Every structure is written in C-alpha cells, then in structure tokens.
Amino acid sequence: MVVSSPSVSLLHSPVEKLSAQLEKTTLLQDIPPGSLSENDNSTTFIKPPLETASSSTPIPSSSSSGVLNPSSVRGKPVACLFVASLNSSRSEEELTATVKDYFQQWGPLLHVKVLKDWLQRPYSFVQFQNTDDASKALSEAQNTILDGRHIRIERAKVNRTIRISSAPHQPYITKKDIDNLLEPYGEVEDVTEIPDQSAFLVRFVYRDEAIAAYTALKHSAWPVLWAENVTYQNGHYKKKGSSPFSPPNAHSRRRKSQGKDQSNTPVIKAPAPIPFSVSSDPPSTMGRSNSAVQSPSYFAHSLVNSTEFSTPNESLSSLPSILPSIPSLESGKAELPTDGSFEQPGYPMNPSMMFAAMPPPIDPYSIFVGQLDPVNCTHYLLVDLFSKYGKVIDCKIIHQSKKPAFAFLRFDSQQAAYAAVCGKTRSPHQKKPLRVEFRQLRPMQQFSPQYQYPSYPYPMFPAPFSPPRNAMMPIPAPMDQFSTFHQSMATLPPGAVPTSIPQSYYPIYSPEMAMPQSYSPMYYTHNPPMDGN
C-alpha cells in the first residue's frame, strides 16, 4: 500500500524536511487495521500525541487513593515531594490520611501516594498544586516529627529531559530549530545549549511529553538521547537536584569542612566526572529502574526503557520505526567556528561506550498491569476496565502466592496502548492503585537475525580489544580436507566467504586480537615437509 507524501524537493531547511516527514505520518492514522500487509514496505507510525500528552488530565476523587483536590489541574513534577522515614507500624490508609492532614497546612494538594519498598518501608509522594507551596514545605517540614518519627523530605526525581544534537555532516542545529521541532509535543520548561558538543538539553514540564517527543523523534535525522535533569551554566554542568529547591547533601558539607581544615594544603584538581548520563532509548511511563548511559550507535539494532521517577537502566530492543529515514538531506560538512568560541571542556568527553548500560525493550502494543488484587481481579473485569482505550486482543493474568497479581494486555493499536499507559486507570474492585506501563521484553526477545550470535555481552571485552561479531559465530565446517580453522573461527556473512581456499592456508587471527568491525581474515602459506625430509 502506497501513501502519498508531500514533496520535499523544494524544502531547503532540514527542519522543514523533517516536518514534511511528520505530516506524512499523520496520513497513516486513517488507514483501517489490517489494510497493511506483512509484505508491505510501508511502516506503521505513531502520531505525535498532541492532546493526550499535553492536555489537562482530570483527577477523579477517591479518598482511598489520597486524591484531595479533584480538578483538571495537572501537577507539575517540580511541585512533587518525596517523603521518607514514615511510621512502618501504620497501614497505607492511615499513613495517607496523616500525610494528607500534615502537608495541607502549606497549601492545597492534588494527591498523596503511599508506597512501600522491597523491605516494606513506607514512603510517600505528595503532589502540591503550587510550586511555591512545595518549596516552602520542603524547607519548613524537613526533619519534623510525624507519627513519632523524624521525616526526611526531598524533591521527587522525575526525569523529563532529552538531548538533541546535530546530525553528522549536517549544519549545526539552532535553538529555533529545537523550538520548531518540539512545539507539537508539549510545553518546554528549559532549553540549554551545550556549545562544545553542538547539542541542546531540553527539559519538558511533564514527563509523558518528554517520552512522547523522544519516541517520535528517535528515528529522525537528529540524534535524540535520554538525559538527566541538568543545566549548563558558565561552561559547567549543574544537576537539577543541586538547585536551591533541594537541600544540600552531606557530601557537599563534608567537602566544605575539609576545605577549611586544609586551606594551606595545595589541592590537585582531578577531572570532573561525566556531568550527565544519557540513554539512546526512552523509558515507558510508570516503571522503576536506575540510571542508564548511551548505548553504542554502531549496534545493529536500536534499543528502548522506563521509570516513573528516574532514568532507564536495562537493555531493550527497538520500537517500530517512528519516522522514516530522510536520505534527501543535504550532505556537507558542518563549518567549525574559527573565532575561538570553542573551549575545551573540563571533563572527559564521552565514557567508553563498550561498558555502557543499555535500556530494556518495550512492546508498543502491550502493557503491564501490576498491583492487582489476586482475589477480586478477574479476566473479564480487567478486559472491561481497559477496553475504553481500545480493543484488547489478549489478556493474561499471573497469580503469585501471597503477592499481588499482575497481567499483560495486548491492544490492536499502539495508540490504545499509549493511552492506557498515560490514562489514570482506577478500579473500584482494587485496594491499591494500578501500576500500568509498557511491557518490557527480554534483551534478545525481538531479535531474529539471519545468523544467531552467542549471548556474550560486549562489555566483557575491553574497548580496544572487542572482537567483531563474525569472530563469535558458529564454527564452520571445513571447506576441504586440507583447510584447518581455529576453534573460535566463525563463518562470515554470505558473499564474504571465498568459494575456495588454496590448500595449506591457515587463518592467523584469534578473538584475543584487536580487529576492526569490517575485518577480513588473512592467510599465510604453510608448506608441509616433503616425505623423506
């Protein structure tokens, strides 16, 4: 099936061409399901969620869930506080009520959530309606007594920043290009330029808008990465957590005290650590995991991750292509400034990508639903609850002994799965709020290459000594009786293997040697001794 697209021959700006490709994706939204065959070369695209991610989401009233002010106002992440050291002897309902009554004195609240970690220690997230009220509560309620315990308060770590850089051999991207590129996806809180890398750090107001922008632009002409909430000021990176909104940590106070005691001692400054870590893949909206760094750009498959209050962690496979490649962009080397405006950064430019953690893959058609009541939750109730977002074609419920059940649901479209993840799904039959996120797949679950490689992770080799993929493939059968192969020798892709090898030729490489990715084995001649010599 062929879908006509606007001509890009008269467009001169890379952003205009990318906008034309974005318009092309909207033409596929009216195609009925099933009209695209498996052999069709066209791609199913996700329309940028203009209303779902940026519009106000009404919050239903529910005393058990801690919602205090049912209105259409969306709570900003900067107005959300993390409260720890709560009394573990009280139930979640009692803690929700006490935390609600305690923090209402600083301002109106939108909701309060009480959760427990793996050690059954309770903690809470308090969402204020106003940022000033949250800042005031953070400074005044710190280390105060609630239910007989000194509580600890921090700013909730809601990561919502992406990094956009200039494409190779393309003109430098400008702030105007960033504004035009990200305008459809939601409100941007801050745009910070990184002059020494020709890139921008873009922090959205809401996390789901950052995920929507990353997902839609991942396969565009601009390299897009997931980043931490940082700012770039006076040539230095500054994490968002070190702003006046959050209290200083003990490490900074210890460094200050040590500096006073050793003021006469010369200090040797070591290179600063990497200011922020990025990931080549986005998270889903509700998961929980740790930080991740960028995966190598030369990997054969793109990888994707997710967290609710942090950056993604584990390795994941790619989503379907969101945007087609744009081969018609002008090719040309970008001009470097000659006025000396480029200063050498005071930190290592990039960590070794060979040891970079990779975020996990997600299935854009399926969702994970956690914290289900094992007694009241049934297959019929779960399908009926999520059918408002789209047609549910599969549902599997997994019951655990003495633990909440969980389920996997598969929709007939990506838009339905995205709406289910972003929606505030609540059930009257559930005692706890549901945990809804995209289904995470195993690292190699979506990979089906022509040649299966062993599951050796690349980080097991140092960066300068990483063997190519063709050095870890199955051992081939001898091509003739005179050919001898090293035990770790692997077959080469079709077309790279010679039809015949001269007799008495041997390969001379092994996986321990340093070889480029496009390595072709070399041979040397070995003359066997003649009989009688």
From Swiss-Prot:
Ordered alphabetically, the record's keywords are: Cytoplasm, Repeat, Repressor, RNA-binding, Transcription, Transcription regulation
Q: Which residues form the RRM domain?
A: 79-158, 365-441
Q: Which GO terms describe its biological process?
A: negative regulation of conjugation with cellular fusion; negative regulation of gene expression
Pfam families this protein is in?
RRM_1
Which protein, by its recorded name, is this? Answer: Multicopy suppressor of sporulation protein msa1
Q: Which organism is it from?
A: Schizosaccharomyces pombe (strain 972 / ATCC 24843) (Fission yeast)
- Stored CDD domains: RRM1_RIM4_like (cd12453), RRM2_RIM4_like (cd12454)
Q: Where is the composition biased (Low complexity)?
A: 54-68
Keyword Transit peptide part of the UniProt annotation: no
Primary location:
cytoplasm
Gene encoding it? msa1
* Main function: Negative regulator of sexual differentiation. Acts by repressing the transcription of meiosis-inducing, ste11-regulated genes.
